[in-house]
Design a protein with these regions (language model features):
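Alpha-helix-loop-beta-strand connector modules within alpha/beta enzyme cores
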Residues: 6, 53-83, 128-134, 186-198
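Catalytic cores of alpha/beta
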Residues: 22-25, 87-99, 146-155
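Glycine-rich, proline-tolerant flexible connector loops at the mouths of alpha/beta enzymes
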Residues: 40-66, 170-171
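N-terminal small/glycine-rich loop or linker at the start of catalytic domains
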Residues: 1-19
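Conserved, mostly hydrophobic/aromatic
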Residues: 27, 34, 45, 107, ...
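Catalytic alpha/beta core domains of metabolic enzymes, predominantly
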Residues: 106-200
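Active-site-proximal loop/turn and secondary-structure-junction residues that shape catalytic pockets
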Residues: 8-12, 46-50, 83-87, 111-115, ...
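A structural motif
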Residues: 36-39, 76, 104
Length: 200
């Protein structure tokens, strides 16, 4: 089956697209419309309602209000926030959302390797996944290069990737990763660890 995820604003400004939602009410309006059109997942960046500035980890109340409004109309849709990775001080909103009455149904972990892997790896991505597991929050893993799949294999060895992997493959117009297309996609899928079912 196809699962549709709607990323409704990211960091795009209204100057580029006047329909881009900023604050929680606008985010909810667009999120509800996407859910009613068939999206199963809504990804929303908390943004200042006037300036559109990303609130990132400071946007807990914005996230909560947007998600309450979406779930009131579309209780079956999954909604989840952004997180910048790099350091855990950029992810406190994830754990606050997980502990809130609204809860956190999904998170995303992008591969931003720091210093490679060793037997005692303490990279922030591993710590983040361990914390998400402790809070019982499922997560997808985002990759931008074929080499990132080697990290996914290591996460599997460490028990951070289960038998089912939700993989986000980022394509863009820059010269990062393989050329977008079926051949490039297959290059990623060929590197999925043995015994793992991959949803992408």
């Amino acid at each position: 089956p196809m699962i549709i995820e709607a990323s409704i604003n990211e960091s795009v400004s209204k100057d580029v697209n006047p329909h881009i939602p900023y604050g929680p009410e606008e985010g909810a309006e667009v999120g509800i419309a996407c859910a009613q059109a068939g999206a199963a997942i809504v990804h929303y960046h908390a943004r200042d309602p006037i300036t559109g500035e990303n609130e990132w980890e400071r946007g807990l109340e914005t996230y909560l209000e947007c998600y309450r409004l979406i779930r009131r109309e579309c209780p079956d849709v999954l909604v989840y926030p952004t997180q910048r990775g790099y350091t855990l001080d950029k992810a406190p909103h994830l754990f606050a959302l997980a502990a809130s009455e609204e809860g956190l149904e999904l998170a995303t972990v992008d591969v931003f390797p720091q210093g490679g892997f060793s037997s005692n790896d303490s990279s922030v991505m591993i710590t983040l996944m361990e914390e998400l597991q402790r809070h019982r929050v499922p997560y997808s893993i985002g990759v931008r290069e074929i080499g990132h799949m080697r990290h996914v294999a290591r996460y599997r060895e460490l028990g951070l990737v289960g038998d089912t992997l939700v993989l986000k493959i980022f394509w863009n117009e820059t010269s990062v990763g393989p050329t977008p297309g079926m051949r490039g996609l297959q290059m990623y899928l060929d590197e999925v660890p043995p015994g793992v079912t991959c949803q992408w």
